[in-house]
Swiss-Prot record:
Organism for this UniProt entry: Bifidobacterium animalis subsp. lactis (strain AD011)
Gene name of this polypeptide: ybeY
Cofactor(s) annotated in UniProt: Zn(2+)
Family: Belongs to the endoribonuclease YbeY family.
Cytoplasm among keywords: yes
HAMAP family from the UniProt entry: Endoribonucl_YbeY
Classification via InterPro entries: MetalPrtase_cat_dom_sf_prd, YbeY, YbeY_CS
Textual note on the cofactor: Binds 1 zinc ion.
Protein name: Endoribonuclease YbeY
Cellular location(s): Cytoplasm
Length: 181
């Protein structure tokens, strides 16, 4: 398994944390050791363009997933091989959601990483039952990962004097956007 992490923002975050999280979730979901995943952190404008192009929804969103080989979770006998796909995360939207939820931006981005992997594996939340199953699983995975790394301090910060790219986007295009995944 391999996880490549790219940070195209000013946010200072440790790519190793997201690589380790991605690998761990893939292992928990029994994805083949030959599978690959890419996680990219972007500013509001690039994710808004992807959001409109692929979902026909305006404005930036928190996370988008782009499956490649349409893998599904494996079992003891079968671990499907292939390119899992790409996850794109906007730290600016994650920050806003984290503030509303009362936890850190880093925790929100880790949750979004798990959410993205589950989408790549075919999970969705169109119905209440799907939402209950997917959100329950992502919470269980996140809490287990935290428990395994008890005492580890993770952070995602901005350099002093950084411009709030979400505010820049909203001034430029307005605030009419649909948050969510």
């Amino acid at each position: 398994m391999s996880v490549e992490v790219a940070n195209e923002t000013e946010w200072q975050l440790d790519p190793k944390v997201f690589s380790e999280l991605g690998l761990w979730v893939m292992h928990q979901m029994r994805v083949s050791t030959q599978s690959e995943l890419t996680i990219t952190f972007v500013d509001p404008e690039p994710i808004a363009e992807l959001h409109e192009r692929w979902m026909d929804l305006q404005g930036p969103t928190d996370v988008m997933s782009f499956p490649m080989d349409e893998l599904r979770p494996g079992d003891e006998r079968n671990e499907p091989e292939g390119m899992l796909g790409d996850i794109v995360i906007c730290p600016w939207v994650a920050q806003q959601q984290a503030q509303a939820a009362g936890h850190s931006t880093m925790e929100e981005m880790m949750l979004l990483t798990i959410h993205g992997v589950l989408h790549l594996l075919g999970y969705d939340h169109h119905t209440r039952e799907q939402e209950r199953q997917m959100f329950g699983l992502q919470r269980q995975l996140l809490l287990t990962f935290f428990a395994l790394h008890h005492g580890t301090a993770w952070s995602a910060t901005l350099p002093s004097g950084s411009v709030n790219e979400l505010e820049v986007y909203e001034r430029k295009y307005g605030t009419n956007r649909e948050l969510g995944h």
